[in-house]
Each structure stands twice: as structure tokens, then as C-alpha cells.
């Protein structure tokens, strides 16, 4: 499904629901240029495509505030309306300290998950503090989502930076509709099991109602990981759905084409 078709699909089916997008990177950054504050759009397919969706249907985008003037540009709820020249939706920023940035982002996300999923095993580097701050940062994102989401919200989480957010949200608000798109490869179980927290990550992702991958192969790999990690998981291979007990939550997996 192209992003243009996705936009139409959301407009037609979810116009009465509050859409909350969650990602590490934000779609608009405020920077100090001399005595002025300038708004910039970071490059990237996710930022561009999801920005168009939210401009069309409204909602909230939760992301890490990384700009030098981001704090100056938000209200007391850490929110700012965007785009600046024609506000259509709310950008809610979360704040991370330097240790969290180093360990959650540069550490666990980019020295563990990214190389592991790309099977660059010589670049995988584990540290306990990476995982500790990865969990802390995911909690910060989840808390921000809960401040904005209501019972009719659809929460759309993006990528490997936020693996634990689905479970955190499900535990606090079971009725939320949760979707998660994984923007990098998902390796076979023989590779992913190298990760010391592999089972915890898979279990967290199974709290989504919908889990998207780039290719059918990545769905097969993920399902293999579930099968090997959770003997009680009920897997329907024809529909690519997984029911995980004891919660009996069903996750559907899809590919992006």
C-alpha cells in the first residue's frame, strides 16, 4: 500500500478517531538562528509521509525534541501546533537527558538492534546500561502517549527505537488500538536470539493489534521467533495472525508494498 493510498484509507475509515503517531524523530525541529527561531523539516521518508497523513486527518505526533529551541517553542504540555504556517495537528515533544540519548539511541537502538537486524554481528555491542536507559526512554514515550490518547485513539508506533512502548501502553490502557511498523529487516530466530532481551522484545511487540514489516520474509522470520520463544502462542500461518496467552491478545502481521 502506497502512502497516498494509506492516507485515503485513514481518511475514509478513521476520520472519527484520534490518530497518535509515535516515533523517535520529530517532523519539525525548532533551531536558534542568531536572534531568531527557525523551523526545519528533517529529511526522511517517515517524516514526510506521516506529516502528510496527519495534515489530512489531524491528531498528535509524539517524538523526541532534539532541536536547540524546541523547549522554547512548546506550551506547558510540551505541545506545539504544526506546520507553523498552517497548523493542522499537534506535535508533543518528549525530553531525554544526555545519558538516555547516549544509551537508548546511540547505544541500544544503534549498537544492538540495528546491526543485529541487519546481520552485522561484528558491530553488535551490548552494555547493561544501554538496555536500562532504553527501557527508561520507552517509558517516557509511553507516558506522553497516554497523556494525549483517549479511548477512541489509534496509536501508530514506528520502528525499532520503541519496541517496549506497545506493552507499556497495553498494560495501562488495554482498549487502545495499537499498530507498529518495523522499518528495518527482521532476522531469523538463529540471529535474533543472540539479543539477551530477545524474548522481552518479542513479547512487547505482540501487544500490538497490527504489526507491519517491509517484506513477507520478515513476517516469516518474526513468526519463527515467536514460535521458538513462546510455546503457547497460537499461530495462524494462512492469515499471519498470532494469539499469545495468557492474555489471549491477537496480533496480525502485514507487509508494506
Q: What is each model feature region?
A:
Residues 1-257:
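Catalytic cores of carbohydrate-active enzymes across secretory and cytosolic contexts
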Amino acid at each position: 500500500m502506497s502512502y497516498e493510498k494509506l492516507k485515503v484509507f485513514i481518511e475514509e475509515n478513521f476520520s472519527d478517531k484520534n490518530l497518535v503517531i509515535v516515533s523517535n524523530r520529530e517532523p519539525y525541529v525548532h533551531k536558534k538562528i542568531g536572534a531568531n527561531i527557525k523551523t526545519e523539516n528533517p529529511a526522511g521518508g517517515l517524516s514526510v509521509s506521516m506529516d502528510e497523513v496527519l495534515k489530512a486527518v489531524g491528531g498528535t505526533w509524539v517524538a523526541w525534541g532534539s532541536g536547540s529551541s524546541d523547549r522554547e517553542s512548546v506550551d506547558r504540555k510540551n505541545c506545539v501546533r504544526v506546520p507553523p504556517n498552517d497548523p493542522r495537528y499537534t506535535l508533543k515533544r518528549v525530553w531525554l537527558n544526555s545519558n538516555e540519548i547516549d544509551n537508548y539511541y546511540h547505544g541500544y537502538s544503534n549498537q544492538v538492534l540495528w546491526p543485529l537486524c541487519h546481520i552485522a554481528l561484528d558491530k553488535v555491542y551490548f552494555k547493561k546500561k544501554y538496555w536500562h536507559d532504553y527501557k527508561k526512554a520507552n517509558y517516557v514515550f509511553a507516558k506522553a502517549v497516554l497523556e494525549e490518547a483517549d479511548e477512541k485513539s489509534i496509536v501508530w508506533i514506528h520502528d525499532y527505537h520503541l519496541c517496549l512502548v506497545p506493552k507499556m501502553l497495553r498494560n495501562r490502557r488495554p482498549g487502545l488500538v495499537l499498530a507498529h511498523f518495523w522499518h528495518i529487516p527482521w532476522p531469523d530466530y538463529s540471529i535474533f536470539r543472540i539479543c539477551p532481551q530477545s524474548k522481552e522484545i518479542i513479547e512487547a511487540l505482540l501487544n500490538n493489534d497490527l504489526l507491519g514489516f517491509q517484506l513477507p520474509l520478515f513476517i516469516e522470520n518474526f513468526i519463527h521467533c515467536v514460535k521458538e520463544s513462546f510455546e503457547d502462542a497460537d499461530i495462524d500461518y494462512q492469515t499471519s495472525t498470532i494469539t499469545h496467552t495468557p492474555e489471549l491478545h491477537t496480533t496480525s502481521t502485514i507487509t508494506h508494498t
